[in-house]
């Protein structure tokens, strides 16, 4: 058993991460999984198992998800206060939003550093490469959600580059029904709709992914059936939402791969 930095073996850190998940202590879950990544690198090769990478994804998604929800709420309150001319309250909300944004930036920086320095370079399996490149795109997209000006453009450019690199591999190497390929298409299409304001491109991408998966539904293995069909449902829901009203940005109704991936 390889010993993880900070005490405990890699296997023990995985167990502790699962405990933290059950206890909904996601910041600690992140810490345990970061130790697993360090232990994997120290053990040579640096690849995580499928279970480990899913635990890492769940940990970070919950930590970032709480702050993304907070940011949306505080931003909405700030706009309402500005709208009714309550300058003092609006300033307080703006200051509080900046605090949440600092936390969002730090969380994204942490996982992006892990991805760039450890996880993407060590990924040998095709599904792992696509998984980590998609994850890289996701966290740059989360930055693009609240950054402004040149920082927003940089985050959007980095998101596009990561998703495109993932898609180039996925289209060649993964079946249309593979849950990672479908999850990538889902999040890539949300990026086009929400960040790049390209509803036509978003709909085209989502529809193509859905149609290709439908045509090969009979090839779906039992182990990935639930994940794949759940993401297909989200793709279809988004298509319905986007095509029903292209003028509406979808707001809180927007769906990405958070739900299906959280169920791994």
Curated annotation (Swiss-Prot):
Sorted alphabetically, the Gene Ontology cellular component annotations on this record are:
cytoplasm
Q: What ranges does the record give for the region Disordered, renumbered to this chain?
A: 245-264
Q: Show the InterPro entries listed in the entry.
A: 14-3-3, 14-3-3_CS, 14-3-3_dom_sf, 14-3-3_domain
Q: Which SUPFAM superfamilies match?
A: 14-3-3 protein
The processes (GO biological process) annotated in the record are: protein localization; signal transduction
Start-end of Basic and acidic residues biased regions: 252-264
Q: Do you know which PANTHER family this protein is assigned to?
A: 14-3-3 PROTEIN
Family from the record: Belongs to the 14-3-3 family.
Free-text function comment from the UniProt entry: Is associated with a DNA binding complex that binds to the G box, a well-characterized cis-acting DNA regulatory element found in plant genes.
**What's the name of the protein?**
14-3-3-like protein GF14-A
Species annotation: Oryza sativa subsp. japonica
Q: What is the lineage of its organism?
A: Eukaryota, Viridiplantae, Streptophyta, Embryophyta, Tracheophyta
Name of the gene this protein is made from? GF14A
């Amino acid at each position: 058993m390889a010993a993880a930095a900070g005490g405990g073996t890699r296997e023990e850190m995985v167990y502790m991460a699962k405990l933290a998940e059950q206890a909904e202590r996601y910041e600690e879950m992140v810490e345990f999984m970061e130790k697993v990544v360090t232990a994997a690198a120290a053990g040579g090769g640096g690849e995580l198992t499928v279970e480990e990478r899913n635990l890492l994804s769940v940990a970070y998604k919950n930590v970032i998800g709480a702050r993304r929800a907070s940011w949306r709420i505080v931003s909405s309150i700030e706009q309402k206060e500005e709208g009714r001319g309550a300058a003092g309250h609006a300033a307080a909300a703006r200051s509080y939003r900046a605090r949440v944004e600092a936390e969002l930036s730090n969380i994204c920086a942490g996982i992006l550093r892990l991805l760039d320095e450890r996880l993407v370079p060590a990924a040998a399996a095709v599904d792992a490469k696509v998984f980590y490149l998609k994850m890289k795109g996701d966290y740059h997209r989360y930055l693009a959600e609240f950054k402004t000006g040149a920082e927003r453009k940089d985050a959007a450019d980095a998101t596009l580059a990561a998703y495109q690199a993932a898609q180039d591999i996925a289209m060649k190497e993964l079946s249309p029904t593979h849950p990672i390929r479908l999850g990538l298409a889902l999040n890539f299409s949300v990026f086009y709709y929400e960040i790049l304001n390209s509803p036509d491109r978003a709909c085209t991408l989502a529809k193509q992914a859905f149609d290709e998966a439908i045509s090969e539904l009979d090839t779906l293995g039992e182990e990935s059936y639930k994940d794949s069909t759940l993401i297909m449902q989200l793709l279809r829901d988004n298509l319905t939402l986007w095509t029903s009203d292209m003028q509406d940005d979808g707001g809180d109704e927007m769906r990405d791969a958070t739900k299906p991936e959280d169920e791994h």
